C-alpha cells in the first residue's frame, strides 16, 4: 500500500463531493442511528445528571473544556507574487500533563510554526514531535508542565446509540461543544478526504451525529463521563449528502497507541504486507470472470515485500485474514492494524476458482 505527501496551500475545493477538510480553512494571506438504544442512553444520562438545571452535556463540557486546545499553524508558501504566509487552525487534546498534545496529522503537516491556545487564554509555542499519515494522528509538544490532561476511555467498549459530545474550535470559536450519539462504528472513509498525505483509507472510525465543523479537526469526541473516546477527523457536509451531521472520529485506542509510539520513537510503525489493492465490486468480478464477488484484488506485489516472500501474486483476491471475512481494502487494513510488525498472519486468497492460504510475516513501515 503506497503513501504520498500533501502540501498545504489555500482553501481546498471539495473533491468528488467528498468530505470537507476539518483542519479548517486556511486563512491565507490572502449515519444511521440510535432508535430505542439512543433513547435509553439519553434517559440514563438524564438520571445521572447533576441536581438543578444543568444538563449532562453541560457537565461533560465542563469536564473536557480545560483539556481541549486550539492549534494555530502557519507556513511560508511560494506564489507568483513571492513568498506568502498561509495560516490555518485546528484543535487538539492534552494527552499528558508534561506538555504532549494529540491532534490530526493534516492539521500540522507542513507547518513552519505551531502555537497552542489553551482554554485559560494562554498560548504556548508548539513543536511537532511527529505525525502519522496512515492514521492521521500527530503529536505536538509545548514547553509547559502540569497541563490538564484529558482522560481517555477504551473505545473498544463503545455501542451505537450512546451519548457523544464533540469539543473543538470550529472556525476559530474556541471551547465549542456539540452533542449527539454514536451513529456507527468501524466506518471507513477514502484517503483523499482529509487533504493529508495518506493514500490508504482511514478505517475503524467512529461515526457520530454530533456536529463537527471546519476547525474541529483534532478535537475530542467524549462520552458521558467526559472521557475521550475519539479524535475528530472529518465530516460529510449536509449540502452534498442530504444527510445531517455525519462526522467521524479516530478511536481513542488507535490515537493513544500511535501517540505513544510517536512520543517514544518519533514515528509509528504499521504492519506492511507489500501489496497494492483495489476493492472487488460485482462489476469488476463479472468483467474479469472472478469467482468471488467481494474482497480486495491484489493489483501489484512488492518484489521485496512479505507478500511476495509468501508466494502471493497479482490477480488474486484477498477474502479473509485469520479466517475473518474481507469485503474491501478497508476491511483488510483494519484487520492488519490489529497486528504488529513481526506477527505472522494467514491470508486467504482466491485465484482461478481456488482459495489458498498464505502465511505472511508482517514487516514494519511508518
Q: Which positions does each model-derived feature cover?
A:
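Bacterial N-terminal signal peptides that target proteins for export
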Residues: 4-21
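Conserved phosphate-coordination/catalytic loops
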Residues: 18, 51, 326
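C-terminal motif of bacterial Sec signal peptides marking the signal peptidase cleavage site
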Residues: 28-30
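Serine-dependent protease modules
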Residues: 32-286, 292-293, 303, 333, ...
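Short glycine/proline-centered loop/turn elements that form peptide/ligand docking sites
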Residues: 109, 158, 279-282, 289, ...
